[in-house]
Every structure is written in C-alpha cells, then in structure tokens.
Curated annotation (Swiss-Prot):
Lineage: Eukaryota, Metazoa, Ecdysozoa, Arthropoda, Hexapoda
Organism: Phaedon cochleariae
Gene3D superfamilies documented for this protein: Cysteine proteinases
GO biological process, one term: digestion
Top class in the EC scheme: hydrolase
Gene Ontology molecular function: cysteine-type peptidase activity
Similarity annotation: Belongs to the peptidase C1 family.
Protein name listed in UniProt: Cathepsin L-like proteinase
Amino acid sequence: MKLIIALAALIVVINAASDQELWADFKKTHARTYKSLREEKLRFNIFQDTLRQIAEHNVKYENGESTYYLAINKFSDITDEEFRDMLMKNEASRPNLEGLEVADLTVGAAPESIDWRSKGVVLPVRNQGECGSCWALSTAAAIESQSAIKSGSKVPLSPQQLVDCSTSYGNHGCNGGFAVNGFEYVKDNGLESDADYPYSGKEDKCKANDKSRSVVELTGYKKVTASETSLKEAVGTIGPISAVVFGKPMKSYGGGIFDDSSCLGDNLHHGVNVVGYGIENGQKYWIIKNTWGADWGESGYIRLIRDTDHSCGVEKMASYPILA
C-alpha cells in the first residue's frame, strides 16, 4: 500500500515538473511577464487547466474519435471567458446587408477543391495582437488577393489605415468592425500599402490625408448568398472571400479538420478569409486564413468542417471587393 502511495506521489511530482517545464517554455516563446507572483500563479493554474483540456481531447484524436487536435499556443494562459471577451470586443453594429448587391454565381462552375495559396495569391498570415482588428485584416487580405489575381500585384495593404480612418463608416478601430464597411471606406478613399502605413496593433489618429498614396482602388463589393453552396461557388470562381465566424471554440486548435458541434453561427464576431476548400478522407472542409499569427493552428490557418450545421457560421456574412 505504501509503495502504491509512493508511486502515485512520484507521478504527481513528474507531472508537475513537466507542467513547470512547459510553462517555462511557454513564457519564453510568447515573451510573457506578469505584474506579480500572484498573477503568475493564477496564469500558471489556467495554463495547467488548458494542458488538461488539450490532453483529454487529444486522446480522442489519437483514438480516431476526433478529426482535429489541440495544442499549446499564445492563448493558453487565459480562460475561455477571457478569450470570449477578447473576441467580443466587436462594438460595431452588424451592417445591414439587405440592399447590398448579390454575387452572380453559376452553380456547378466551381472546382471540387481549390487552394488559392497554391496559386500564389494569398499573402502571409498576420497577427492582430490585442487589437480587435480582425475585420481590418480580413478586409485588407481580400483586396490583396483580388489584386494579385487581377494584376499579379502582391503588395501588402494597410489594415492600420482601416483601423484608424474608417470609424465614420461604421467600424470601431480596435473595438471591432466588418469587412463590408471596410470595403466601402476603400471604395471612397483608396488604401495605402502596409509599408507606407504600417500596422501598430492599436488605434491612432488617421494619417491617410493624401489619396494619391493609395495603391489600390475599388469600384464596389458584393455579398455572397448565405449558404455554403454559394460560398463554395464564390471561393472557387472569384477568389478568397471575407467572412465572419464564431471563433470562441477555436482557441486551442492545433491542426486537423475542426469539427465542433458547439460552433454554431448564432454569434458571429471574428473576421477571417476563406481561401479554399477540399475533401480529406471523405470529409469536406474550408481553408480559413486566420488573424492570430502563423504560430497558431496550421501555420495560421484552420481547416473547418464544411456542409454541416456547425461550420461556425462561415457562410452567413461573406463578401468580396471589386477592384477598379
């Protein structure tokens, strides 16, 4: 009996040591510092809870009971509630899409699978940081891809200009916004390059006072009918599309095809880009370009289950720009 207790105690010590090692690596990787020992202890406890959640889920993945796995990332020391609140910064009122021109799509024209990354028209993944600017990054990325498709230009555009300058168009800088509002702003004002108006991750005074510095112009934008069939046709024939999803369940995503029955489309708050779709082992998926940096998910991307009632609402608010 004493031996069993001793072995159990040893396992606890080993697990704790492992957690401590992972914690040290996490803090180094993500340059974490905390204002007090009390705060660090709290964050370490949350980190341990995250580790347990990851381990429990990944057993299901290894046993073939799940199609995706979880991993430690920059969000591993915050609670699910804190992550939700971070995503829920979106103070912008949802735009009325009723009067917006609908994309004229031909059903059946899209290929069975496509990945616009392989065609060289998707620029690198960005990291929004602590600014609620996913909508601005999504707006810029959609325009970048259309520009690359139309003219071969691969100039990174300025989401910071959108953050700083499009408040009068219904956006709220680091507190949220929507791609269609961003497209409307660019249609009227153009958009500078990221080199000329670099991303800072915080809202500032608008510095875009000279439209001649713009490197791209829009004549308009269109919405995609709210169905996954229409979204497939749009992505397959037009290019990467801006979309909005329910992002909370994606916090610890590491890879695979994300299939979570809780990821419904009732609470859309995170701007992304749909850059392709495909099928793996009979399972359909979307290829989503996220805004949480290349160290999250599959090099900054998530493959999201397609043609289900829990595709995170990806089809509900899709739109794309039309270049001049």
